[in-house]
């Protein structure tokens, strides 16, 4: 019986899709703007259509899922229309990149119920919300306001006034390193794109941008440019036809990348993680502001190895079977990093240089030992000691840090707490600083 019902529902959905393509959704006939609560009746569902992005067949599957739940609750099947065939209307449930401004929200605005559930990740979350919290009765009233947000996508933070650049470090978690609690990169890419739109870092050092991230990241960067006018370009995404896990993103609508390069310290293979090659390296680039070419600076990005315990109890470099003492590991990583940073300082006298990275080393290592890369300062400690504006002060357990050398002023320092909404994307907290120089 259940199978028969599902077949029936699929047929109805397909028929509605076929009938709805190219048709206009019903408009608000009165044109009046209501100032009171939104009064919803189940028969009003007949006005709505589900508009899905035709870039990806997954969105039609999500439209079917939502239609199934609405039919089960109300006995109504909505028209399903491809975004390329849909005329904008107040009565839409939007799935994916439909050509409208991405909002990732369910709101009541101007007396109308507006639903836009964004990409595939937020679509799943919002569909659950709609069916459990909104479409839960034959009638209900909603006051004006916001009822659903993918909060990580909308927690906008403007850059501090008088800052030259916002520099961020972000480990976005390679699929191979993610446990079962995380979605695959093609889902999480939506959250990462939302973070870029909300926080708009100027230069971003990313770690663990693996092969799966490479498959989807450029597509989302293109969507950001189309929908928000923010242009991000990638630097050093690969090296010798191998993926560079520690690459750079930068806003090419604000800055020019004058030069870029990377230095590889070693390669390793690990079949267990399906990595044929993984490079340990420092990537860097020199930038200048488009509106002030004299403002030049460098950003370097790295990812330090972390130790693993093998069955015999020996500590090894990640991906290696060669035993190594913990202090030897730290010394090796810092010496490798110092070697390239010292060269960059010599070749760029007087130019501020900033280092982003996942150091797999908690804050006390730097604060207790007093070690920083050659002539560099730990920006979080510098911000604390100078009374700079700080939000979400980091715990001592995080591994992601920013360093700087040269003449600069910290306008703001922020740390994303990975115990809340941020954990949907990665197991690492992001960190950024607004800097003037």
Where are the model-predicted features located?
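Acidic, contiguous N-terminal accessory segments
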Residues: 22-110, 114, 118-129, 133-157
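N-terminal, active-site-proximal structural segment of metallo-dependent hydrolase catalytic domains
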Residues: 156-222, 297
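Structured beta-strand-rich core segments of catalytic domains in phosphoester-bond hydrolases
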Residues: 209-306, 414-416
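Metal-dependent phosphoester-hydrolase catalytic domains
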Residues: 341-354, 359-437
């Amino acid at each position: 019986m259940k199978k028969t019902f599902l077949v029936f529902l699929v047929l109805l959905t397909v028929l509605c899709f076929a009938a709805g393509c190219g048709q206009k959704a019903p408009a608000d006939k009165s044109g009046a703007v209501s100032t009171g609560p939104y009064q919803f009746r189940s028969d009003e569902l007949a006005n709505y259509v589900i508009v899905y992005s035709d870039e990806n067949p997954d969105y039609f599957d999500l439209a079917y899922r939502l239609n199934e739940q609405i039919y089960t609750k109300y006995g109504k099947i909505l028209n399903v229309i491809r975004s390329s065939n849909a005329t904008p209307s107040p009565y839409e449930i939007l799935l994916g990149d439909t050509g409208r401004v991405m909002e990732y929200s369910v709101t009541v605005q101007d007396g109308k119920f507006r639903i836009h559930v964004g990409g595939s990740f937020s679509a799943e979350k919002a569909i659950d919300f709609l069916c459990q919290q909104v479409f839960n009765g034959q009638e209900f009233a909603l006051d004006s306001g916001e009822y659903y947000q993918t909060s990580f996508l909308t927690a906008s933070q403007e850059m501090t006034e008088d800052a030259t650049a916002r520099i961020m470090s972000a480990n976005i978690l390679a699929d191979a390193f993610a446990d079962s609690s995380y979605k695959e990169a093609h889902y999480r890419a939506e959250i990462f794109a939302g973070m870029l739109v909300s926080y708009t870092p100027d230069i971003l050092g990313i770690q663990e941008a693996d092969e799966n991230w490479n498959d989807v990241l450029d597509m989302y960067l293109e969507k950001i440019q189309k929908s928000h006018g923010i242009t991000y370009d990638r630097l050093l995404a690969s090296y010798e036809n191998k993926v560079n896990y520690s690459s750079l993103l930068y806003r090419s609508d604000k800055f020019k990348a004058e030069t870029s390069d990377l230095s590889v310290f070693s390669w390793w293979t690990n079949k267990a993680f399906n990595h044929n090659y993984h490079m340990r390296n420092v990537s860097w680039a020199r930038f200048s502001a488009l509106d002030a070419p004299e403002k030049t600076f460098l950003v370097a990005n790295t990812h330090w190895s972390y130790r693993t315990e093998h069955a015999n109890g020996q500590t090894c470099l990640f991906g290696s079977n060669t035993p190594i003492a913990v202090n030897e590991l730290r010394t090796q990583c810092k010496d490798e990093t110092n070697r390239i940073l010292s060269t960059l300082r010599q070749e760029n006298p007087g130019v501020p240089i900033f280092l982003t990275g996942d150091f797999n080393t908690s804050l006390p290592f730097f604060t207790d030992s007093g070690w920083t890369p050659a002539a560099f300062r730990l920006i979080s400690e510098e911000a604390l000691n100078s009374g700079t504006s700080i939000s979400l002060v980091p715990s001592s357990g995080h591994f992601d840090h920013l360093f700087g050398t040269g003449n600069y002023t910290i306008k703001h320092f922020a740390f994303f707490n990975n115990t809340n909404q941020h954990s949907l994307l990665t197991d690492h907290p992001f960190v950024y600083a607004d800097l003037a120089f």
